Amino acid sequence: MRVLFWGTPAYAVPTLEALHGAGHQIVGVVTQPDRRRGRGSSLMPSPVKARALDLLGDVPVLTPQRIRREPETQEQLAALQADLSVVVAFGQLLPPEVLQQPPLGCWNGHGSLLPRWRGAGPIQWCLMEGDAQTGVGIMAMEPGLDTGPVLLERALDVQLLENAAGLAERLSHLTAELFVEALPRIEAAGPGPEAERLSRLAVTPQSDEGVSLARLLSKDDYRIDWSERALAIHRKVMGLFPGAHCSWRGKRLKLLATEPLVARLADQLSPQAAALSQRQWPSAEPGSILEAVRGVGLVLATSGCPILLRQAQLEGKAASSGDSLIQQLS
């Protein structure tokens, strides 16, 4: 099939590679414009653009600032005569004019079990809220935000010690697998009026119950409050990886890996943390050091059970763990 691919971050790259590997013709790639990144503030292409240029040769790569406001770009897309659009973390809402172009529709790979966590940050919110499961849905796109009916969906369990980067890696490959499975079904259903196409595909409308929105994160969301409970703090550290931070003796401290020392969660913790979770700990000022565990990290007080800080990055220094972390922060 002739596929127009929309995507921007590294999360979308496995799907681009999988569709190309499955023999589909990628007739164009749409991604966010180059951005200034790094210490030198050099203009850098998105991961999808970089991979597309390497993988697909002279296939056109379009980088609209605002696809809704660019009729010329929309005309360029129509001229590619794609059979369908595949969208994975593109980063902009597609206007109706674009959604109506491909005869087999526009399909989005969304990283949650819809209708939970519609929006741009489903992975972060899933982890911050402690969801036991998440997954991927292949959804027929419509003008609403992640409201379309679902063709395929697959769930996976979320691990307590899994951070956003690790979960995103798993979900990105699951998205690729599901699109490779979905496209032959979409092709077999054929073109036609949207309602008839979707009926032939037996898509599942989203429920009106259980809807939640993965709102955009603010700077305040990334600040850790030690007066919260250990599990809530841990979930923020995992969900906001690598951005959760606090102030430590006047410097910013990024929190990269923690374990909540909650006895009932011992079977999900590392052996060292599981043993620590069984101890009786004294009450102390939230955020203060209760114990430095040699070769492991620092046990810090919270409003309830303590939390084990295993890896962090102090402002102006490299990330550290174990004894190096203890030396820096003690």
Swiss-Prot record:
Keyword Phosphoprotein appears in the UniProt entry: no
InterPro entries the UniProt entry points to: Fmt, Formyl_trans_C, Formyl_transf_N, Formyl_transf_N_sf, Formyl_transferase-like_C_sf, Met-tRNA-FMT_C, Met-tRNA-FMT_N
EC number from the UniProt entry: 2.1.2.9
Keywords attached to this entry: Protein biosynthesis, Transferase
Cited Pfam families: Formyl_trans_C (PF02911), Formyl_trans_N (PF00551)
A GO term from the CC aspect: cytosol
Catalyzed reactions: L-methionyl-tRNA(fMet) + (6R)-10-formyltetrahydrofolate = N-formyl-L-methionyl-tRNA(fMet) + (6S)-5,6,7,8-tetrahydrofolate + H(+)
SUPFAM superfamilies named among the record's database cross-references: FMT C-terminal domain-like, Formyltransferase
CDD domains for this protein: FMT_core_Met-tRNA-FMT_N, Met_tRNA_FMT_C
Enzyme type, top EC level: transferase
Binding locations of (6S)-5,6,7,8-tetrahydrofolate: S112, L113, L114, P115
UniProt-recorded Gene Ontology molecular function terms: methionyl-tRNA formyltransferase activity
Role summary: Attaches a formyl group to the free amino group of methionyl-tRNA(fMet). The formyl group appears to play a dual role in the initiator identity of N-formylmethionyl-tRNA by promoting its recognition by IF2 and preventing the misappropriation of this tRNA by the elongation apparatus.
Record-stated family: Belongs to the Fmt family.
Protein name (record): Methionyl-tRNA formyltransferase
Native organism: Synechococcus sp. (strain RCC307)
